[in-house]
Amino acid sequence: MTEQLLLHGTLEVKIYRIDKLHQRSRFNLCGKGNKEPTGKKTQSQIKRLTDSCTSLFGGHLYATIDLDRSRVARTMMRRHPKWLQSFHVYTAHSISKIIFTVKEDEPVSASLIGRAYLPVTEVITGQPIDRWLDILDENRRPIQGGSKLHVRVKFTHVTQDVNWNKGIILPSFNGVPNAYFNQREGCKVTLYQDAHVLNEYPDVTLTGGQVIYKHHRCWEEIFDAIWEAKHLIYIAGWSVNTDVTLVRDPKRTRPGGDLKLGELLKKKAEENVTVLMLVWDDRTSHEVFKRDGLMMTHDQETYDYFKNTKVRCVLCPRNPDNGDSIVQGFEVATMFTHHQKTIVVDSEVDGSLTKRRIVSFLGGIDLCDGRYDTVEHPLFGTLNSVHANDFHQPNFDGASIKKGGPREPWHDIHCKLDGPAAWDVLYNFEQRWMKQGSGRRYLISMAQLAEITVPPLPIVQPDNEEGWTVQVFRSIDDGAVEGFPEDPREAASIGLISGKDNVIERSIQDAYVNAIRRAKNFIYIENQYFLGSSFGWNSRDINLNEINALQLIPKEISLKIVSKIEAGERFSVYIVIPLWPEGKPGSASVQAILDWQRRTMEMMYTDIIIALRKKGLDANPRDYLTFFCLGNREKGKVGEYLPPEKPEANSDYARAQESRRFMIYVHSKMMIVDDEYIIIGSANINQRSMDGGRDTEIAMGAYQPSHLLSTNNMRPVGQIFSFRISLWLEHLRVTTNAFQCPESEECIRMVNATADELWGLYSAQEYPRNDDLPGHLLSYPISIGSNGEVTNLAGTEFFPDTNAKVVGEKSNYLPPILTS
């Protein structure tokens, strides 16, 4: 077997051209050979040859780059095979060779011309390779005419990255390289946990009583921002429900707070505020099919509500880009979504009666039903108050307020950007509106904006300790935005990736990879999904070539832990995910996702255990990497809502109601690194969100220059640190000094022990307490074998109150592209 080596770092690849490509003729496509005929006769011959080749090849040839089985790049399609195209590729793959494949595009798929190979043993040295490679057929023989492909390859090992393992070092740190949006200095950032925080919830304090974090209230601040807008309100969402009420806390009323979202937006439009909405068009929501659609996003209802009003609401399908084949185009249009959740408004400027500023919101929370929740995450106690008209429980058949709880609690994270980065969120909306809205029609022009707003300049002075530096990232392609350059060289210069005949931005995945590589001490993740790096999965019972869940984040995390074990340094990773993905837990789609998740975990724990053994350490892998979920269990209370109906006997619904427990659904999309850097957005840690050509996403990465590991060699104690402590207080209901050093064995073991105890209380057949569950952070119910294999926790084959397997089950009929 050919030797495999770990290629962990960055590949710089340039594909130039093919020297000649014969096809039943002595002439070649590129016009290069031993003799160059001249004259009108020869020109006629060449024209006939070109016409015949266009017929044979469709006039469209492209090349791909594979790391063994993993496709990492592809060129644009060209009539003649001369690309001159460069690629910046992050790698974390154990491979034997780099494969360059030349294909002819066809309407349905593509046909193979040939492949060229470059052994990893040559690449891994780091020396530049500039070479003509033989193009071979499937039997490894030169194709007709002995054609060659000209490539240049340069590998840089991850340890040679100037930021590797160093955190953020100023002034040299310039943000994530090769990204579409640059990092913006002098911003303000507001961080939100959940849609609302009650007055009774305490501020976060350190030992000695020092207040380090005051809570902000997401939906109230969104309401205020919309209410106070004078010129523009731009909303993009996966789901927008006109019936939701943003302000519900009776102790925090305000003028207009009783308005529903739809009423509020119509009111603002009547005040001559430009209100534009981009709502994902669920292709399954159609009068002919099911009006609310398979995803129940209310898109058609929202569109109908605003019809013939001053609010401009556009339903946006996830249109395929021009480079997709018919099959790929069908996949994109029917399987993928517009998943961004953004709001852009104008807001007042202190000290100015005429000028306004741009403020943007982004994150995981859609403006729709089921999202309003507090850090208490009640199951039954609010069904006769704030959730009486907002009962959300999609995990049980027939669930409704009439049959009672448990409702599905919702944990999420969002943020507000103020300053130059807020404008990048505005630009994103404008690009999307021009592509799928109404062109420039209805958008406030840049000239008008210049008259009514202050320019996108820093709003915080460099010496202000509360200042932020922010960079906006996306997963998106030119099927969804206007303005991406067609020339691949121009696209590459602004951080874009050129595909067959499309242009992709994949900067969210790049942001995660860079942040993980910079990490020194710990990583804390909350995400709705956690699966990927399928190139590293065990292939004993699956064909890895069919999975294509290639995003690098899980492998980058396990390799970071391995590097720390090898160096004899502490490093801890905490990952919070839902108990299962939203939906019927025993359904084929949920079980398939859980199977991918289990394989991802297994790959990571295998890497860690191998590294521990090499160092002669008999350590628990959960001291380095640990997974959690959230759940609640409530005791009945006097005056609680009494449903007039009952769930079907012996159903999951009935059992959950009897046991009075249910998972808290983790919908967050957040990563904190070393308490100095945070990523928040709409992107899940799966292929759909990180691909760029699948679901469209937006995120931001941010830090406070005055609160870095490199500042005075002290631990950061800025807003990111405080936000993490606040989240841990929400989940664990306690704070301790150990939480200030998450990488320590003391901290991770304390958190694991508490979560183990809480899982025991949550899963117990008979609940032994007379009060609610004393914390929400539960150990994910898996067991880790001696070689890294992941199985269900002993005695927990199925999720509580269900017959659904904890570790999932491979689907034999659902396409992996749908569930990965």
UniProtKB/Swiss-Prot annotation:
Tissue and organ distribution: Expressed in buds, flowers, siliques, stems, old leaves and roots. Expressed in the sieve elements.
Positions annotated to bind Ca(2+): 194, 377, 411, 730
Induction comment: Regulated by the transcription factors NAC045 and NAC086.
GO MF entries: calcium ion binding; phospholipase D activity
Predominant subcellular localization, coarse grouping: cytoplasm
Topology within the bilayer: Peripheral membrane protein
Residues noted as binding a 1,2-diacyl-sn-glycero-3-phosphate in the record, renumbered to the chain: 339, 528, 667
Domain C2, first and last residues per copy: 1-133
Record family assignment: Belongs to the phospholipase D family. C2-PLD subfamily.
Protein name, UniProt field: Phospholipase D alpha 3
Species this chain originates from: Arabidopsis thaliana (Mouse-ear cress)
Source taxonomy: Eukaryota, Viridiplantae, Streptophyta, Embryophyta, Tracheophyta
